[in-house]
Design a protein with these regions (language model features):
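Acidic/glycine-rich phosphate/pyrophosphate-binding loops and surrounding catalytic core
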Residues: 1, 5-74, 78, 90-95, ...
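Short secondary-structure boundary segments
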Residues: 83, 106, 127-128
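Nucleotide-binding motor/catalytic cores of P-loop/tubulin-like NTPases across gene-expression machines
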Residues: 85-89
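Cys/His-rich Zn2+-binding cysteine-cluster or related metal-binding knuckle/ribbon modules and their
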Residues: 110
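Short, charged, intrinsically disordered terminal tails
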Residues: 128-146
Length: 146
């Protein structure tokens, strides 16, 4: 059911949220598997710029402060601080120093979102908006087949 991701994205927007990306042309998100295949954060960002110059933003998901430094130097537009402690996020924001936008991701809950906001990140992403939402039991039937 290929249309369901669009439905989920519309539901997030209807509830006042913003989608990370609506489709692949909105931006490149470089995750651990892309970085591993490229060999480094720097090489992954260079390849994204070379092969997808039409995209609006290049975002790099980082897991530690060394990756933060490399993403900044490589020219990432957005740096996603994934599953970092509050102390690591504070240090990452200090290192980035406004040279890229920041996003916090991983273990975001209703209980800690206000505190995460106070750290000064530009974006906070939470999968809980879609993966923890109550499910509606619906059925799709082809009436012509009945």
């Amino acid at each position: 059911m290929r249309f369901l991701p669009d439905v989920y994205k519309r539901q997030v927007r209807a509830g006042g949220g913003f989608n990370h990306r609506y489709n692949l042309s909105d931006g490149v998100l470089l995750k651990d598997n892309h970085i591993g295949a490229a060999g480094s954060v720097t090489k992954a960002v260079q390849m994204a710029k070379e092969y997808a110059p039409f995209v609006r933003k290049i975002e790099v998901e980082v897991e530690n402060l060394d990756m933060v430094k490399e993403a900044v130097e490589a020219g990432a537009d957005i740096i996603m601080l994934d599953n970092m402690s509050v102390e690591e996020m504070k240090e990452a924001i200090r290192i980035i120093d406004g040279r890229a936008q920041t996003e916090c991701s991983g273990n975001v809950t209703k209980e800690n979102i206000d505190h995460l906001t106070s750290l000064g990140v530009d974006y906070i992403s939470s999968g809980a908006l879609t993966h923890s939402a109550p499910v509606l039991d619906i059925s799709l039937k082809n009436l012509h087949a009945l």
